[in-house]
């Protein structure tokens, strides 16, 4: 109903079983991309092109090296969640230490080491406050880094709030990875209303 022909599923701490994944994709005639969302010492990182979770991936430097070796692609997910909304009991994942100073301007955040270890920045996340998404977009702009969007949906309710739109049609995981490395994508909004457009600040 929304016009989705494909989905990328980023399971926490490890991708779905490959055979189960392929069976589901074939059964429903949909392009499914298998990936994972890894909890690291520098927040959550989306990892594409990695076959399985490996020991040491909780260190983003280790994950980054493994991704490069495998021809993968990694993205810092919702990097500034809770920076402005500041929930009572949770620190932002990029600034976990009590004495970590929270950024106010994009220039305050641009030197965080995470941005030297990932390929792109998620700037449109369905589970993150608009102000924090906008801030991520501004930081990525200062750094001239590629940007992505994602629903971060944990049920069908949130699917498609934000997406990553690709210039060319994606038919499989290989084409998906090639498009990521080519930079031929952008975050988008409006899929749910039938008015897909680039996400901008």
Stretch-by-stretch model annotation:
Residues 10, 36, 77, 151:
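Active-site flanking residues adjacent to catalytic metal/cofactor-binding acidic residues
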Residues 33:
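General small-molecule cofactor/ligand-binding pocket signal
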Residues 57-61, 77-78:
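Ordered, amphipathic secondary-structure segments that act as subunit-interaction surfaces
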């Amino acid at each position: 109903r929304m016009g989705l022909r494909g989905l990328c599923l980023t399971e926490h701490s490890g991708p779905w079983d490959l055979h189960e994944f392929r069976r589901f994709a074939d059964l429903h005639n949909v392009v499914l991309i298998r990936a994972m969302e890894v909890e690291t010492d520098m927040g959550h990182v989306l990892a594409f092109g990695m076959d399985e979770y490996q020991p040491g991936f909780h260190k983003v430097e280790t994950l980054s090296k493994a991704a490069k070796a495998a021809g993968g692609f990694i993205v810092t997910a919702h990097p500034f969640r809770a920076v402005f909304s500041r929930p009572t009991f949770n620190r932002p994942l990029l600034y976990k230490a009590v004495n970590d100073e929270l950024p106010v301007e994009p220039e305050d955040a641009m030197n965080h080491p995470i941005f030297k270890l990932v390929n792109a920045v998620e700037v449109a996340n369905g589970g993150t406050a608009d102000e924090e998404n906008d801030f991520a977009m501004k930081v990525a702009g200062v750094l001239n880094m590629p940007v992505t969007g994602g629903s971060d949906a944990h049920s069908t309710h949130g699917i498609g709030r934000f997406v990553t739109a690709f210039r060319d049609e994606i038919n499989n995981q290989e084409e998906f990875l090639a498009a990521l490395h080519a930079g031929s994508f952008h975050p988008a909004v409006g899929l749910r209303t039938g008015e897909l457009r680039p996400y901008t600040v």
